């Protein structure tokens, strides 16, 4: 049957009943289930409860557990805020149906087995073979066939209902009721596995309650552990769980359940001490004592009974004598039946070095009994004696207490205990008989070991009569093994020897040989007094014997001594040698044994360390891989979650968009939410394309089938509209005239109203002005006072503002002064830094100038001086090689302040000016070098010097021009003009032998005595000049000044400052104009 998501609840219920009548229960169940899951009807009504009851009945009939679980969770969300009682009704009805069907299945299984047993005919071969192969009885096979499916269904029902109702305060009572029914189910059908799972499920639910106790926005109906009702329900449920575990004899689960009960009691006690009732403690200790007895822990069994007796006594101040006697007798018998050494770790724990684990277990068990320290037998006996347990116990328990704790009669203690035990008849007391016999036998054995050094086996049998030979021998061995007594069985002499054993080849005596006392029995039973009495009697008897036979004994002793002396003298060397040999043999054996033991221990320790290291490395590797895998999975999960959230957001936006409503209607909301956004977009695009094509097709069809009748109707309608328009145009003037008449009448009426109002105002105007003047006169003083107050307030505000402004100006001047001082200090530091860098640069230049430069080769490219590619000029006459001469020395100029310290600005190319294009003044000189000329500096200097020498030698001297005498470009430094040539030969330096050495122009003044001052004087104008000014005229000779100084170590591309003209060539061009 196809699901119907939008069917009304009433119709769905009616439809389901109709389907049930025709035998289609499965279809009816699907119909009801779809109605419960439908999102349209989310308001609870009574019809929903009827639907759920019918749904649960069908689920039980068809064994559809998963549908029942899904429907119950849906119904919980529906009734959580409205009617929780309806949910409880449905759950109870569902469980009753499941329990009834399970009981019916059990009865049916028994009836089928009985039916088979009543047949007169024998078993057929098939049944016999099945019985042999399966190895089970007929009832077991029938239970597996008929009962097992319903048991599984009922167990799933309980578990699902508990999962449904967990951590919900509204249905907490029903939750605990179902839990107790579940325990009854496990006990009735002996479902041990299900009982363990149920206990684990309840523990998990409690952990979740504790985890989410204070978590915000988790569950508004969560169970609160501060509620006494909730704690009481949980405590009662855990006690029933403990009782069920004991009845099913699941002692491990009983112990865990006891821990759960203890935890609940501690939690309740922390919240409110009055929450836990004394009766609960009595029940708890009773069950816990039974668990300890089944576990074989008689020490804690007795401690639990003692705690129960104390609480029972406090709960009933005046309880009857019979009740007190019964409880005290049981406590006393349980305490006396505690064996020796029950509170100490076993031999296995000592040998395996796990005594800490034993102490931890003792502490844990003590916590379960609410004891601050671990109990001991002596402690329990003292506590019992303090509260009067021996006095309140029965006569049998009293007699046993006196025999075992207050009497020293080693030869008849066991017989007396056996005679008393024969009078015990109650079943709850008979369980202690065997333990009491073992305690009495050990007690008698200890007392005998104190008195005798050796005793025959037959006498031991008579002293301890209630054991066989084998059992008695096992008792002696166990007592000696647990170091209760020091005894050895001598089978050759058929006796038992007490005391320490002799030293053997394996080492010294046992550790227990150093212990002289035995668990405090010496002080309790008077052993020390008996020993002293026997020693005194022995001393007196010995003295009496020696007094009666003194002479005879003296002669015998002397004779015996003489014989021993003779024998000693005869065998002394042999005995001495034998003793030494035996001692040496023992020492060697002991050394070898110790060495072997040490080697084994070292080898074992090394092997253990290797195994531990390997295990540790393997564990670290596993943990590392596990962490990496977990991190990868976490990142992948985060990515998947992000992608899922993005898709959900996209689908939600699409769902809100009206464009995608057609897809939602066709696919359904659930299927639409599961779709991929890309798929939705692709499908919507296909739909739009399809609709567009359909629309285009229809339009084309309409164009073909144009309706001419409609066109004719439109033409007629146009004529009608034209007639209506003409009629309205003819009536428009009349309507306008009527509107104007109405408007004029309205204006006239308004004017008359205004005139009337003015007349009324004119009548009272003088009186109004008189009243206003009188009011002003009456309030003249008040007005003047307010004006004076306002003036005073205004003056105060004005003075305050002026004071504030003055203060602000004062602060501003102070801040400006501070900032100016800071700027001055910063500028001073910068100047000092620049000066320091200049000194460093000067030292670097001096160091570099000391080394000569390599002369450039005279190639064709180097002799090409027409770098401006101007028209070819006439070649100069050939020159002869002449040595270079240094120019005249210039006096160092004085320091001119911060202007000399300013760093040179970087070269900036400027557009060509008129002076750049004027080449008239260059008619007698070589063209100047452009900033971007990349030719060799050394070759250019050589060429300029030679050219100037030729010109000075051939041309007559010329007067200095305005460009030579102008000093604006040099900032006040007048260029040095060479004197005119005369016939007198000029003084020149003597020619040096060997190849001519080239001297850079910026070093000539230094060689001539100019020093560093000239270099500094020449570099100042270049640093302070404007970068947009054209180079000075001495650039025509291609001479360069010293390299720049400052932060930038690269050579500057603009021209150097002017230097002295030592060639006599002053030039004839008027260069003053381009320097301005």
UniProtKB/Swiss-Prot annotation:
InterPro entries in UniProt: EIF3A (IPR027512), eIF3a_PCI_TPR-like (IPR054711), PCI_dom (IPR000717)
- Where in the cell? Cytoplasm
Subunit: Component of the eukaryotic translation initiation factor 3 (eIF-3) complex.
> Which GO biological-process labels does this protein carry?
egg-laying behavior; embryo development ending in birth or egg hatching; formation of cytoplasmic translation initiation complex; translation reinitiation
Gene3D superfamilies for the chain: 1.25.40.860, UVR domain (4.10.860.10)
Which chain positions lie within coiled-coil regions? 574-651, 678-713, 776-843
Q: What does this protein do?
A: RNA-binding component of the eukaryotic translation initiation factor 3 (eIF-3) complex, which is involved in protein synthesis of a specialized repertoire of mRNAs and, together with other initiation factors, stimulates binding of mRNA and methionyl-tRNAi to the 40S ribosome. The eIF-3 complex specifically targets and initiates translation of a subset of mRNAs involved in cell proliferation.
Q: Where is the composition biased (Polar residues)?
A: 918-927, 1060-1076
Tell me what this protein is called: Eukaryotic translation initiation factor 3 subunit A
**What Pfam families does UniProt report for this protein, alphabetically?**
eIF3a_PCI_TPR-like
Which keywords has UniProt assigned to this entry?
A: Coiled coil, Cytoplasm, Initiation factor, Protein biosynthesis, RNA-binding
> Where mainly located?
cytoplasm
Against HAMAP family, the record matches this protein to:
eIF3a
- Family membership noted in the UniProt record: Belongs to the eIF-3 subunit A family.
Domain PCI spans what residues? 324-503
List cellular component terms (GO).
eukaryotic 43S preinitiation complex; eukaryotic 48S preinitiation complex; eukaryotic translation initiation factor 3 complex, eIF3e; eukaryotic translation initiation factor 3 complex, eIF3m; multi-eIF complex
Recorded GO terms, molecular function?
mRNA binding; translation initiation factor activity; translation regulator activity
Q: Where is this region: Disordered?
A: 600-641, 826-1076
**Ranges of Basic and acidic residues compositional bias?**
608-641, 826-857, 865-908, 929-956, 964-973
